[in-house]
Structure formats: C-alpha cells, structure tokens
C-alpha cells in the first residue's frame, strides 16, 4: 500500500513537471514565431501622442457585479498559477511593443520652434543692429522710412498668427517617419534666413551702411519673403489635399465592415492617420462575440467511414467494390449544417425581438413613473430628487430587461452598470424621451461612442510595401494592424471624365398650333 502511494505521488510530480516543461517549450516556440513574424513584416508604428505603449485591452482588471458578467474564471485546486494562450500572446506583444519613449516628435517640435523664433527675430535684429553699433554715422530716417516700421510690425504680427495657426497645433498622432513637405519648408526657411544673414553681414555690417532707410527696406523684403513661404506652406499642407484624387476602400479584416472615402494628394502615413480618425466615428464598434457561429453548428461532427478488408486475398475485389459504394454513398449525403444555421439565426432574431420589446416596455414604464413624480412634486412641493437619485430609483425596474437584452445581443461587455446609470442620469437631466435613451442600446453605434477602455488602441502598426513617406498611387494596398484585427486599405485613382457638349436649338421645341372653327380647345 505504501509502495502504491509512493508511486502515485511520483507519477503526479513527474506529470506536473512534464506539463510545465511542455508549457515552457510551447511558450518559447510561440515567442520565437512572433519574433520571426515581426521581423518578416515591413511595418512601422503609429502611436497616439502622450499615451503609454501598452494597449488598453491588455488591462482586463475591471471589477463588475457577479450577475452582470457572463464568464467566470475558476481556479481549481491543482492550478495555483494559471495563464491562457491569449494571455501569452498579449504578454509577448506587449513585451515587443514596450520600447523606450521616442523623442523624435519632441525633437521636431523643438526644431520648428527654434526656427520660427529665429525667423521672427531676424528682421528685428536687422533693424536694431545699425543704431546700436554706429548710430552717429547713420543718416536720419525720413517719413517714408518711419512708415516702413508700421509695415514691418503688422507683417510680423500676421506672420506670427499664421505660423501659430498652421504649425503649432496639437499633433493628432506620432508619425513613424518625417513629414517630408514640412521638413522641406523648414529647410527652405532656414536657407532663406541664412542667406539674408550672410548678405546682411557682408554688405551692411562690414561696410557700415549709412542709409538706414535701405536697411529698413532690406528687413521688409525678408518679412515679405517669409510671408510668401507661409503662403506656400498653406498651399502644400492644406489646400493640396482638398481636391479628391483617390478613392479608398477600408475593410475591417474580421467582420468585413467597409467604408469608402475620397482623399487628395497625401503620403501613406498621413492617409493612415486620416483613416484612423474616420474609423472611430464611421465604423461600428468591433464586437468579437458576433463573429462566432452558433454552438450547435460548431459542435456538429461530420460522420466518416473506415473500411477494413478482413477477408482473404480472393475477396479483395469484392471488398474494394463495397468500400467504393460506401464512400460514394457518404459523399452523396447532404450536410444539414446550413439548415441548422438558418434556424439558429431565426431563433436568435426572434429572441432579440422579444427581449427588445420587453426592454422598450420597461423603459417606457420607468420614464412614465418619473413624469408622474414630477407632476406630483409640482402639485405638492417637497424634497426634490436629483437626477442621480432618480436614475438609481428607476434603474431597478429596467435592469433585468436591460441585462437580458444586452446579453442576447452580445453587447454586455461594452455597457457597464455605471455607464448605463450615467446615460440614464443624462437623459433625465435634459428631459429626453425613452427612445432617446434606448438609441444607444438598440443599434450598434460608432466606435467613439463607447468608453475608451473598450476600444481605444494606443498603438497601430502600419504595414506597407511602399515607403510610408511616398504619396498615394493607384493600386497601393496597406494595412493598419492592431492586436485584434486590421484595417485593409486599397487605393483607386479617381477616373478622368471626358464630357462632350451637344447644342439644342431653342427654336426646335417650338411649334405652331392652327385652330379651326371645329377644333375644341
């Protein structure tokens, strides 16, 4: 008996060690595959500014009521530390994405600010240096020269406001590569300012120019040149992209939701940022629970046949003929999975309509109760109930119907009890109708409508065969990937339309109506 107990304990330990070794080997193979796959893709990363690198979906520690959630994690007596394959995938992805903070965005902003400050102070320095260095030798500034001071002041003010409005805006995303057009404009401004400084140093500072009016006109010319550069920046950065040149088709890889957009001349990385802006308010929220087929269809097993020849060698031909007949009969059998799927979908739609009707009735009764209380308070004034207390008071009457409806439509992960209470409080505060309250739950809304912890991805990966700084071309396809799904973007150029004119003589539509005495009009 002791021997048996020792043997059973040893077998349990060895089995546990073997399972742990298999778990470590499987984890190592998964990490190596994920690294190899990440090396094989030609991808760059677009990250939202000022946000951590870890995805919101990696934090699943939200506390909920026991009756409010559908799933429960059970820890058995033999599993002290449990982890799923999805957790391993998420951890590996987060470890690969947790890189040091990229300072390229701050470096670009700092370089632009320094260049703008240099460009703004250069005309002022041109005007102040001659009076400070050789005031006695300067010729007096006349009326025309003094009028140029006003011109310089207002032009610099316009340039300052225009530069602030165009360049110093809060960035929407951290681009993986340099914005080529903006970099070219910065280089152009730098060369312009350096050229003016070289000319000013050689022809004015060294020669000690006595005509102060000429110095002022030189400063005015620099301000005019900077204004023209600013106008060029407006054309290249803002106006050039307004004319539609390409049609983009954006498809979500998991459920096939698609949208079409028209864009102008933009680089691939700027188009990617623009598509993400459109995605959050045009696409319905991504719900992975809606992608699964009914359990009855998935659990259906296709029956198969195995034919064995148990006779002698003489009966080989007979057994072969019988096996062929059996296999042919099995092939002719029709699979009824589509019928089961059809009836499952019909039953689901019936259940949704039933839950929806109960929810609508419950909400109508709750709002009717609120109106009745408001009328009674007007007749008999007493302690007034604030919207939060009113929402908590009527939520109990609709909570069960709401919970069943959200569970049936698989929207429960996107609507917590607190969010429903806040929305109900908002509707009561603004005297909204029951239909306005139910609008959020009866149909899937845009992604941005829901709480950020449910949908916002801090990091997207742009996968493209072309350099992301290149402009759009006909036939270009690129991907915007995140952990759960990806957006596939295909590009088509807007076709060229040729119109012809056909002139219609207005006289060709005229006719003469001759009336006779017998004609009745």
UniProtKB/Swiss-Prot annotation:
It holds the Pfam family Strabismus. It comes from Mus musculus. GO terms for biological process: anterior/posterior pattern specification; apical protein localization; branching involved in blood vessel morphogenesis; cardiac vascular smooth muscle cell differentiation; cell migration involved in kidney development; cochlea development; cochlea morphogenesis; convergent extension involved in axis elongation. Belongs to the Vang family. Keywords: Cell membrane, Developmental protein, Disease variant, Membrane, Transmembrane, Transmembrane helix. Residues 69-81 have a biased composition (Low complexity). Residues 57-67 have a biased composition (Basic and acidic residues). It is found in: Cell membrane. This is Vang-like protein 2. Residues 15-33 have a biased composition (Basic residues). Homodimer and heterodimer with Vangl1. Interacts through its C-terminal region with the N-terminal half of DVL1, DVL2 and DVL3. The PDZ domain of DVL1, DVL2 and DVL3 is required for the interaction. Also interacts with the PDZ domains of MAGI3, SCRIB/SCRB1 and FZD3. Interacts with PRICKLE3. Residues 130-147, 200-217 are extracellular. Involved in the control of early morphogenesis and patterning of both axial midline structures and the development of neural plate. Plays a role in the regulation of planar cell polarity, particularly in the orientation of stereociliary bundles in the cochlea. Required for polarization and movement of myocardializing cells in the outflow tract and seems to act via RHOA signaling to regulate this process. Required for cell surface localization of FZD3 and FZD6 in the inner ear. InterPro entries: VANGL. The chain crosses the membrane at residues 109-129, 148-168, 179-199, 218-238. It is linked to Defects in Vangl2 are a cause of the loop-tail (Lp) mutant phenotype. Heterozygous Lp mice exhibit a characteristic looped tail, while homozygous embryos show a completely open neural tube in the hindbrain and spinal region, a condition similar to the severe craniorachischisis defect in humans. Homozygotes also have complex cardiovascular defects including double-outlet right ventricle, perimembranous ventricular defects, double-sided aortic arch and associated abnormalities in the aortic arch arteries. The gene is Vangl2. Residues 1-81 are annotated as: Disordered. It comes from the Eukaryota.
